[in-house]
């Protein structure tokens, strides 16, 4: 046998057979023939380009043989192969044409055995064929029968797709990284990662992508289109994957479980982030100062310390913030939005932390105790503020007048006395105030709300100061008995002022 040629691994059609093929079959044929040619070139077997390959590359009909020559050459089939598979199970011209060329490989090349379901099971004895088999991850000569459906498949009539579906094997492998895929088209797309090719460009902003699907998804940023809608709550998304993730909120599904502690998550990315808690790993490092963080978002937040920038501006009042979340919270001052509501009394708050703090009022819990005097408080911030009474610390200084304060928020309010700024406006009467708390108190004039109630007689008041004045009536009638030092430390201020 002579050296392996392209003709040995090529399939040729008559005009009649070619016209019997549909578009998908023609495209498949073209892809496989060109792939065969490239493999032979890779092995150094083919030097000159065959006419068939030229026709296929130019999109022409691949009719390299004369019509009468093709008609005069009926398929020469092995007797056993013909008995098992021909003509009952092979009904279309596509399969017939494919089989013709392989049957032309005579018995000195392929030793067919009776009852064998795969020509690929027989060893190819000639060196040229062995070289080709080593190059091709999938034997291009393989013709096999599926016992499950009783149909004959061939590589060129989607046998690879068929085998992948039934075996789960990824047939198309990337030479660069070794990753395997079920479809050649997926492999072609994947290769662009290595080449850096991004042929799909957004006309709106110029951003380029590897895949057309990614460009389609990207365009929705400009159009605002959200085609994927949740049937449960009506929320819409730009990507189907985001909708899939969102649905787990309704189903409660948490398929991603931490092997270390058993905690489960909706998304694999959340699990990956969580695992850092156990490892203590801090893979995200600030290039400016070298400080490391567990999450990339923390690095982004940290970097603003170096730039000192405040990129997030309030359109309403012009105030700037370092973080987008702080701007979102700030906007609630202007909108009056209070999304966090107490189930006990119905009071609503701007921040979830304020609601958490408020709930302690209902429980009466005072977990924060001063080490200096033993006084207990509902909140850690109140304790921290109280401790400054003992230390006398006032670290926040006004540049205008030199006055110092225990808290930065109090300093901010104080500064407005110099600037005259009154950002908090009453929608009811138009009156403006320097502090949001003053506006809240003022609104009670319009609403008639009296949240401060005397525990002794049940009388209610608009302001806490009025309640304190009222309490003196009851205190004057009752002596305050001091039994120990702790009671002395906790003498009500109102009683001290009366005595």
Curated annotation (Swiss-Prot):
Keyword Cytoplasm: no
Gene Ontology terms, MF aspect: DNA-binding transcription factor activity, RNA polymerase II-specific; RNA polymerase II cis-regulatory region sequence-specific DNA binding; zinc ion binding
Disulfide cross-links: none
Keyword annotations: DNA-binding, Metal-binding, Nucleus, Repeat, Repressor, Transcription, Transcription regulation, Zinc, Zinc-finger
Subcellular location: Nucleus
One record GO biological process: negative regulation of DNA-templated transcription
Tissue: Expressed in bone marrow and in monocytic and immature erythroid cell lines.
Zn finger limits (C2H2-type): 172-194, 200-222, 228-250, 256-278, 284-306, 312-334, 340-362, 368-390, 396-418, 424-446, 452-474
Annotated Gene Ontology cellular component terms: nucleus
Parts forming coiled coils: none
Key word Plastid present: no
Domain KRAB: residue ranges: 4-75
Family the UniProt entry places it in: Belongs to the krueppel C2H2-type zinc-finger protein family.
Function description: May function as a transcription factor. Seem to have a transcriptional repression activity.
Protein name, as recorded: Zinc finger protein 253
């Amino acid at each position: 046998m002579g050296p392996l040629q392209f003709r040995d691994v090529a399939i040729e059609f008559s005009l009649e057979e070619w016209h019997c093929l549909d578009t998908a079959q023609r495209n498949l044929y073209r892809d496989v023939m060109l792939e065969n040619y490239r493999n032979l070139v890779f092995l150094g077997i083919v030097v000159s380009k065959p006419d068939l390959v030229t026709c296929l590359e130019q999109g022409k009909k691949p009719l390299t043989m004369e019509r009468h020559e093709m008609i005069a050459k009926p398929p020469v089939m092995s007797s056993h192969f013909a008995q098992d598979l021909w003509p009952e199970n092979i009904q279309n011209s596509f399969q017939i044409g494919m089989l013709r060329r392989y049957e032309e490989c005579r018995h000195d090349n392929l030793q067919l055995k009776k009852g064998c379901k795969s020509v690929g099971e027989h060893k190819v004895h000639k060196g040229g064929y062995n070289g080709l088999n080593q190059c091709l991850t999938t034997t291009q000569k393989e013709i096999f029968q599926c016992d499950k459906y009783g149909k004959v498949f061939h590589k060129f009539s989607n046998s690879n797709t068929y085998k992948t579906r039934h075996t789960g094997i990824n047939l198309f492998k990337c030479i660069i990284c070794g990753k395997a895929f079920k479809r050649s088209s997926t492999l072609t797309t994947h290769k662009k990662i290595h080449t850096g090719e991004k042929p799909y460009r957004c006309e709106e902003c110029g951003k380029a992508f590897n895949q057309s699907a990614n460009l389609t998804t990207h365009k929705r940023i400009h159009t605002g289109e959200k085609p994927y809608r949740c049937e449960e709550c009506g929320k819409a998304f730009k990507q189907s994957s985001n909708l899939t993730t969102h649905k787990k909120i309704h189903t409660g599904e948490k398929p991603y479980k931490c092997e270390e502690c058993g905690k489960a998550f909706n998304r694999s990315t959340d699990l990956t982030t969580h695992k850092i808690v156990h490892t203590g790993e801090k893979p995200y490092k600030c290039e400016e100062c070298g400080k490391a963080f567990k999450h990339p978002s923390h690095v982004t937040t940290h970097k603003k310390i170096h730039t000192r920038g405040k990129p997030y501006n309030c359109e309403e009042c012009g105030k700037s913030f370092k973080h987008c979340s702080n701007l979102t919270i700030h906007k609630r001052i202007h909108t009056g939005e209070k999304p966090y509501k107490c189930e006990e009394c119905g009071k609503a708050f701007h921040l979830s932390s304020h609601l958490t703090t408020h709930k302690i009022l209902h429980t009466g819990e005072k977990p924060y105790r001063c080490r200096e005097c033993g006084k207990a408080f509902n909140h850690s911030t109140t304790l921290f503020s109280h401790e400054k009474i003992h230390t006398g610390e006032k670290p926040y200084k006004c540049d205008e007048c030199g006055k110092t304060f225990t808290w930065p928020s109090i300093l901010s309010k104080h500064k407005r006395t110099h600037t005259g700024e009154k950002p908090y406006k009453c929608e009811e009467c138009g009156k403006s105030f320097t502090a949001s708390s003053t506006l809240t108190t003022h609104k009670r004039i319009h609403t008639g709300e009296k949240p401060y109630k005397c525990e002794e007689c049940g009388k209610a008041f608009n302001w806490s100061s009025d309640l304190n004045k009222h309490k003196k009536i009851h205190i004057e009638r009752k002596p305050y008995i001091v039994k120990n030092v702790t009671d002395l430390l906790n003498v009500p201020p109102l009683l001290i002022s009366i005595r």
